[in-house]
Amino acid sequence: YEVTRTMARVAMGVQKAETVIKNARLVNVCTAEIQEGIDVAIAEGRIALVGDAAHCIGPETTVIDANGQYIAPGFMDGHIHVESSMISVGEYAKAVVPCGTTGIFMDPHEICNVCGKEGVRIMIEDAKRSPLKAMSNAPSCVPAVAGFEDTGAAIRADDIREMMTWDGIMGLGEMMSFPNVIGAEDNIHAELAETLKSDNIITGHFSIPDTGAALNAYIA
């Protein structure tokens, strides 16, 4: 929680930045313009100031001259199954980071269907070795709909409880088993409960045209 105090002090110049990038062209995605001569002050891995950062520079500050190069916020991919591309997170990063994607929210559903929780852990550990900021959801439906397909593993509520404690897990993966949600099936609702107990998010996946009672039951 002290990071907010640090950011304020750096922005005001009371505490000097660790790094300042000077003389950049900022792609301002809020105003849809290119702003010339912009500096960025950084401390504790966070941006403290965007603008004129001369007052943020101290004797120990690393100063990088962007020399008019463009800087922009990184793209965040809000939902992806990396393993569907038949590559690892590291190889995926090589393809997307140069194009501006710096973060992903991945749902390793497919590898979990084959390898179970260990497959999810492999994906998370692989992501830590890549330049991507990769956040993961715990796969919720393994198999996707019980009784309709065979899988190499099955995920139950106690597995969700465990995965919610893992570093890198941000929530519950897309809940594709909408028949079991609206039908109040025990294990599915236990998975939802374990996610809520851990104060994490639940992601949805409702794919039938019933926008009446069924949709309301799913959302509720």
Where are these regions (language model features)?
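Divalent-metal coordination cores built from histidine and acidic residues
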Residues: 1-10, 15, 90-201
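Functional cores that coordinate and move charged inorganic groups
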Residues: 189-220
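Histidine-rich, glycine-flanked metal-binding segment
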Residues: 1-20, 25-73
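Hydrophobic alpha-helical bundles that form the membrane domains of multi-pass transporters
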Residues: 13, 20, 41, 97-99, ...
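Di-metal (Zn2+ and/or Mg2+/Mn2+) metal-binding site signature of metallo-dependent hydrolases
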Residues: 69-92
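Short beta->alpha connector loops
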Residues: 88, 177, 207-210
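Divalent metal-coordination and catalytic microenvironments
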Residues: 24, 45, 68, 79, ...
